[in-house]
């Protein structure tokens, strides 16, 4: 049986960290708030991770994939309140996604019960995390620049209309994405062509 601690649902045998307890308690406290009370009642989280970014830190809250849309509805109010509670640390909400290994070929291959779904591939999970990381901004374009030494730099173009909302956080987005995936990414707000 999964263990339920406040708003946190942990799978069997997993130890609950102190930051997870704090975020779970903060979500319970926010349920009494009028802004998000009705929507937050049905929602829960499955994990919390704190990422150190030089002199700052960010808190990544993992939620179940089916509940991600519901979290997006209350995202601005929820993030604002949680950032107040945690002393200005940046709060990011991501879906907990699983990456399945590539099926092996040749003599090492084991028979598979079913084909690996596209949503469980490394590329699909990394792309989905990128979209969730910059929410409420929208990714309008992506470019991959391969340098002469073979290193790849990902350029992500965000919607110019959201620059005031998330413009100050793009350094945090890049650092967290590098920690999660190992990919260097830069965010830009290009002017619309048309």
Curated annotation (Swiss-Prot):
Protein family membership: Belongs to the eukaryotic ribosomal protein eS7 family.
This protein's name: Small ribosomal subunit protein eS7
UniProt keyword ATP-binding present: no
Parts of the chain that traverse the membrane: none
Family annotation (PROSITE patterns): RIBOSOMAL_S7E
Keywords: Ribonucleoprotein, Ribosomal protein
A cellular component term, taken from the record's GO annotations: cytosolic small ribosomal subunit
GO biological process: ribosomal small subunit biogenesis; rRNA processing; translation
InterPro entries to which the protein is assigned, alphabetical: Ribosomal_eS7, Ribosomal_eS7_CS
Pfam families: Ribosomal_S7e
GO molecular function: structural constituent of ribosome
């Amino acid at each position: 049986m999964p263990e339920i601690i406040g708003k946190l649902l942990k799978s069997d045998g997993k130890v609950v960290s102190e930051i997870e307890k704090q975020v779970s308690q903060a979500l319970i406290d926010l349920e009494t708030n009028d802004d998000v009370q009705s929507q937050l009642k049905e929602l829960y989280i499955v994990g919390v991770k704190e990422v150190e970014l030089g002199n700052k830190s960010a808190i990544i809250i993992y939620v179940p994939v089916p509940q991600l849309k519901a979290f997006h509805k209350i995202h601005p109010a929820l993030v604002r309140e949680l950032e107040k509670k945690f002393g200005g640390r940046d709060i990011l909400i991501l879906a907990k996604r699983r990456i399945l290994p590539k099926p092996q070929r040749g003599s090492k291959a084991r028979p598979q019960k079913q084909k690996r779904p596209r949503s469980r591939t490394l590329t699909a999970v990394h792309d989905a995390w990128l979209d969730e990381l910059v929410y409420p901004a929208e990714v309008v374009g992506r470019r991959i620049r391969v340098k002469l030494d073979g290193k790849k730099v990902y350029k992500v173009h965000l919607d110019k209309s959201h620059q005031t909302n998330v413009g100050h956080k793009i350094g945090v987005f890049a650092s967290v994405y590098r920690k999660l995936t190992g990919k260097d990414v830069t965010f830009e707000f290009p002017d619309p062509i048309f």
